[in-house]
Amino acid sequence: MKDATDVISAKDLPNLSSFDWQDPFNFSDQLTEEERMLQESVRGFAQNELQPRILNAYRNATIEPEIFREMGALGLLGVTVPEEYGGLGEGYVAYGVVAREVERVDSGYRSMMSVQ
C-alpha cells in the first residue's frame, strides 16, 4: 500500500510546521484594528487577572463574585449592548473575539459572560 507521499507530489503536501495551531483560519488577519485592540485588551485581562484567580478558585473550591463586577465594568457582559445602556456597542465579531479570549482561560466564565 502506498502512503500519501508516494501519491501526492512534494509541492502539494501541506507544510504542517508552518501551520498556526493557535489561529488555524487566520482569523486574526481578518480583524479590524479596533477588534485587534479589543482582543489584546481582553487577552491581557484574561491572562493577568482572570487566570490566576481561577486557578486559586479551583484549588480551594471557591468563586470570586467580584470577577463578575470587573467583567461588567470592562463592558464584557454587554459587548453588543449599545453604549447608552452600559455596553460596548460593538458587533458580533467583537463579541466573538471577547468570548474566545475568555474561553482560552475558563469556559465557565465565558458561559457566564454569554448568558448573564
What is each stretch, according to the model?
Residues 2-15, 44, 48, 75, ...:
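Alpha-helix capping/hinge segments and adjacent helical runs
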Residues 39, 62-66, 87-95:
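A structural motif shared across PLP-dependent enzymes of the aminotransferase-like
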Residues 52-73:
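Short secondary-structure junction/hinge motifs that connect adjacent elements
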Residues 73-116:
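Internal helix-loop-helix
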Residues 1-34:
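Intrinsic disorder at enzyme termini
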Residues 11, 20-22, 26, 58, ...:
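Residue-level signal for pocket-adjacent positions within structured domains
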Residues 29-50:
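Mature N-terminal segment immediately following signal peptide/propeptide cleavage
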